[in-house]
């Protein structure tokens, strides 16, 4: 019997399934008599921060560190190590961010307040999207899984840049200076060849504190720390510090941090919303940005890049399969909810509207993408 849970947790789809369960639980609780207790729990103050802030500002910094480790590994030695490998996912990521943002802006052009959410539909949830692909098994060629992974990594890079550049407020230059000194220390440690993880993690904790107090979102500390974790070691028989850290935190991020984030952020009280709320510019812009904008931007620029000879279609794939993956990328969830919380931090109603839009767009994208890939021909036409 013990083999069953072991097989489940080692499955590529496991993380997405656990995240779905946690998010569904949040929606159920938020629309039940337990709602008040749920809200009290999230607002409970512990060591100066609410539980919700500890999850979104501290635990999610660990998630962003894992994203940063993956980005560094793929850029230096993996699927994005050469310009040729970066071409198709690069064009696709560009279209997959620009078109959803444009659709959102089109629906919200009349309001300066809601325009702040333009980046919400620009992100892809790699855990969900790869989880759906895993459910389809061998029907999807390995090249498409690599394409989706590379695209999502570049998407994450764009989302991180957006958070750092556009969702900061009340900058404390003193704290920012402290963060800069800490980054310089990390650089020196890296150049000095220090391979023990503890000094890096200790400096990372200090960096997180400075970022939290600076006005730049604290999760950026996770990305910055990841950039300085050594990838290469002199002894080829030894695992690199980056690989050790990535393998060490992956299960915690997948099965604890992201489900906690989903439970803390997906709970929306639908009973308190009117039809006008559900069809207002924010949820409609987010949902259509994810479901329509993602597939149009990713597939459109992929087709254009291949047609112009700037990139190559993934091996052993059909254009219909590429389109199916483009639709799947409309699963925004984690990063979209995260950006929504930043964009509308002072407006709980707008945050709830974002949740509705993200859930609607992501569910449509998951179902449509899975159906397209399930029934698409598995061999490219000649």
Curated annotation (Swiss-Prot):
Catalyzed reaction equations: Na(+)(in) + 2 H(+)(out) = Na(+)(out) + 2 H(+)(in)
Keywords: Antiport, Cell inner membrane, Cell membrane, Ion transport, Membrane, Plasmid, Sodium, Sodium transport, Transmembrane, Transmembrane helix, Transport
Role played: Na(+)/H(+) antiporter that extrudes sodium in exchange for external protons.
Family listed: Belongs to the NhaA Na(+)/H(+) (TC 2.A.33) antiporter family.
Predominant localisation class: membrane
A GO BP entry: regulation of pH
Membrane topology category: Multi-pass membrane protein
Pfam families xrefs: Na_H_antiport_1 (PF06965)
InterPro entries on file: Na/H_antiporter_dom_sf, NhaA
Name the record gives this protein: Na(+)/H(+) antiporter NhaA 2
Molecular function as annotated in GO: sodium:proton antiporter activity
Organism of this sequence: Klebsiella pneumoniae subsp. pneumoniae (strain ATCC 700721 / MGH 78578)
Domain of life where this protein originates: Bacteria
A GO cellular component entry from the record: plasma membrane
Localization per record: Cell inner membrane
Gene transcribed to yield this protein: nhaA2
Spans through the membrane: 8-28, 49-69, 87-107, 115-135, 146-166, 169-189, 209-229, 252-272, 286-306, 325-345, 353-373
């Amino acid at each position: 019997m013990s083999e069953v849970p072991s097989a489940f947790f080692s499955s590529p789809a496991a993380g997405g399934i656990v995240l779905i369960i946690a998010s569904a639980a949040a929606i159920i609780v938020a629309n039940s008599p337990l709602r008040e207790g749920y809200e009290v729990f999230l607002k409970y103050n512990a060591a100066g921060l609410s539980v919700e802030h500890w999850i979104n500002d501290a635990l999610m910094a660990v998630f962003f560190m894992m994203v940063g480790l993956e980005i560094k590994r793929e850029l230096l030695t993996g699927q994005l190590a050469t310009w040729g490998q970066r071409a198709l996912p690069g064009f696709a990521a560009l279209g997959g961010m620009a078109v959803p943002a444009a659709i959102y802006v089109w629906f919200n052009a009349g309001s300066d307040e809601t325009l702040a959410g333009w980046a919400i539909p620009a992100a892809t949830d790699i855990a969900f999207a790869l989880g759906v692909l895993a459910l389809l098994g061998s029907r999807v060629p390995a090249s498409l899984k690599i394409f989706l992974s590379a695209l999502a990594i570049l998407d994450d890079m764009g989302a991180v840049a957006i958070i750092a550049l556009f969702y900061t407020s009340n900058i404390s230059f003193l704290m920012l200076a402290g963060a800069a000194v800490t980054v310089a220390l990390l650089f020196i440690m890296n150049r000095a060849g220090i391979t023990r993880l503890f000094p890096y993690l200790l400096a990372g904790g200090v960096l997180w504190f400075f970022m939290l107090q600076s006005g730049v979102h604290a999760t950026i500390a996770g990305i910055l720390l990841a950039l300085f974790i050594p990838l290469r070691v002199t002894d080829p028989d030894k695992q690199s510090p980056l690989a050790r850290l990535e393998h060490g935190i992956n299960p915690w991020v997948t099965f604890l941090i992201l489900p906690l984030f989903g439970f803390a952020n997906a709970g929306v009280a639908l009973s308190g919303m009117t039809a006008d709320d559900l069809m207002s510019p924010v949820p409609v812009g987010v949902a259509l940005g994810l479901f329509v904008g993602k597939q149009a931007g990713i597939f459109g620029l992929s087709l254009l890049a291949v047609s112009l000879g700037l990139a190559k279609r993934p091996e052993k794939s059909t254009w219909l399969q590429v389109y199916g993956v483009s639709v799947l990328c409309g699963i925004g969830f984690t990063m979209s909810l995260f950006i929504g919380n930043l964009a509308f931090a002072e407006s709980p109603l707008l945050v709830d509207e974002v949740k509705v839009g993200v859930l609607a767009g992501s569910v449509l994208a998951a179902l449509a993408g899975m159906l397209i890939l399930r029934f698409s021909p598995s061999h490219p036409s000649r």
